[in-house]
C-alpha cells in the first residue's frame, strides 16, 4: 500500500467518523426528546 493510498483511506475513515458520529448522537438525542415530548 502506498502512503498516498493510506492517507486517502484514513481521510475516508475520518470523514465518515466526523459525519456519522454527530449524526448518530443527534438521532439518539432527537428520538429520546421526541419520546419524552409525546407522552
UniProtKB/Swiss-Prot annotation:
Keyword Signal: no
Keyword Thylakoid applies: yes
UniProt-annotated location(s): Cellular thylakoid membrane
Domain of life from the UniProt record: Bacteria
Major subcellular site: membrane
Example GO BP: photosynthesis
Membrane topology annotation: Single-pass membrane protein
Any single Gene Ontology cellular-component annotation: plasma membrane-derived thylakoid membrane
Known role: Involved in the binding and/or turnover of quinones at the Q(B) site of photosystem II (PSII). PSII is a light-driven water plastoquinone oxidoreductase, using light energy to abstract electrons from H(2)O, generating a proton gradient subsequently used for ATP formation.
Protein name (Swiss-Prot/TrEMBL): Photosystem II reaction center protein X
Organism: Microcystis aeruginosa (strain NIES-843 / IAM M-2473)
